[in-house]
Structure formats: C-alpha cells, structure tokens
Amino acid sequence: MDYFPMIFALLFVAFQGAPEAAVLGTELSTGAESGGERPVPTTPWRPRRSKRCSCSSLMDKECVYFCHLDIIWVNTPEHVVPYGLGSPSRSKRSLKDFFPTKATVHRKRCQCASQTDKKCQNFCQAGKELKDQDSMEKAWDNRKRGKDCPKLGEKCLQQQLVVGRKTRRLETISNSIKTSFRVAKLKAQLYRDKKVIYSRAH
C-alpha cells in the first residue's frame, strides 16, 4: 500500500491551515489593496448588561435583585447570593463621584436607567424614605436613652451597652426578615408576569 499520496495531502493541508501563514496572507492582501496603509484594529464587541437601574451600594441585596435583570440568584445553605455581577460595563465617572459634596450625601437608593419607568422611580424613592425613617427613629431612641443616664451613672452606661447590643441584633434580624419577604414578593411577582406572558404566547 502506498502511503505517499496520503502523507503529502496531510502535509499540504497542515501547511495551508497554519495560522501564521493565514494571518500573513491577509496582511499582504489588505496591504496591497489599501496601498500600504494599515487597517484600523477593531475593538472586540462586549455584551452590555441589561440594568433597570444602578444601586448606590451593592450590599443592598434587594436593590441589586431589582435593578440587575440578568443576574442568576444562587441559593446557598447560608443565604441567597447573586451570581454574575463580575465586571459590569459602566460609564466613566466624573470627579463629582470621587469628591461627594454635602448635597449628594443624602442620595437615592438607586438611579433608574429610564426616567419614564415609574415602578423604578417609586422603588428608589421608597428605599430612601425608609432609610431616612429608620435613621430618625434611631436618633429619637438615642435621645430618649440619654435623658435617663445622668441620674444612675455607671450602672446606666452598662445597661445602655447591653440594650444597644440587643437592639442592634434585633434590628439585624428584622432587616434580614424584611429583605427576605421583599425578595420573595418580587420573585412571586416575576413568576406571575412570566406565567402571564407564557399563557399569552401559547
């Protein structure tokens, strides 16, 4: 059996399919066509993440769940975590973002991508109002506690520390419960919307 034609064909295919040769060939052909000018290199296309709004803090899980539409939420034994937040494309920031003024200290919970999206506007505004209300309640509680202390002295301060720890723990628990209820509500609403769209399609 003669293997020479098969080996020759394989070598021919290997040398013709070499990437260096192919690249060199394209460079020569484009150079000849354009008269020696180099072609402008094109940047690779990057898919943009679909965002309804951008949160002021990624620690606010409810806001992240509401705003980032393409995040897959993964259930872990401890908590629900977002998957797919890595390197979201964002516009360049101005110097105002790096040096916040007094006017921007009380900013919204999030910033909507579309100004006509009423649901988003309500969500971002409601979050800001809730935060303001919580901070006002905390300040009022602290003021009430401070009135009783001058009478009792050191014992009062120790009691305040214990009460402060307990209240912080209770606040953390209540906040996590509120967040989980809100997330469950949003998930149920999302599921209902998908069901309606699916039933209309079929």
Curated annotation (Swiss-Prot):
Annotated spans, Disordered: 29-48
Gene Ontology terms for molecular function: endothelin A receptor binding; endothelin B receptor binding; hormone activity
Residues spanning the signal sequence: 1-25
Propeptide: 26-50, 74-202
Stretch list, region Endothelin-like: 110-124
Keywords: Cleavage on pair of basic residues, Disulfide bond, Secreted, Signal, Vasoactive, Vasoconstrictor
Keyword Transport: no
Residue spans crossing the bilayer: none
Cystine bridges: 53-67, 55-63
PROSITE patterns the UniProt entry points to: ENDOTHELIN (PS00270)
Name of one Pfam family that matches: Endothelin
Keyword Disulfide bond: yes
Compartment list: Secreted
GO biological process, one term: endothelin receptor signaling pathway
GO CC annotations, alphabetized: extracellular space
Annotated positions for site Cleavage: 73-74
Family under the similarity heading: Belongs to the endothelin/sarafotoxin family.
Functional summary from the UniProt entry: Endothelins are endothelium-derived vasoconstrictor peptides. Probable ligand for G-protein coupled receptors EDNRA and EDNRB which activates PTK2B, BCAR1, BCAR3 and, GTPases RAP1 and RHOA cascade in glomerular mesangial cells. Also binds the DEAR/FBXW7-AS1 receptor. Promotes mesenteric arterial wall remodeling via activation of ROCK signaling and subsequent colocalization of NFATC3 with F-actin filaments. NFATC3 then translocates to the nucleus where it subsequently promotes the transcription of the smooth muscle hypertrophy and differentiation marker ACTA2.
Protein name from the UniProt record: Endothelin-1
Recorded name of the encoding gene: EDN1
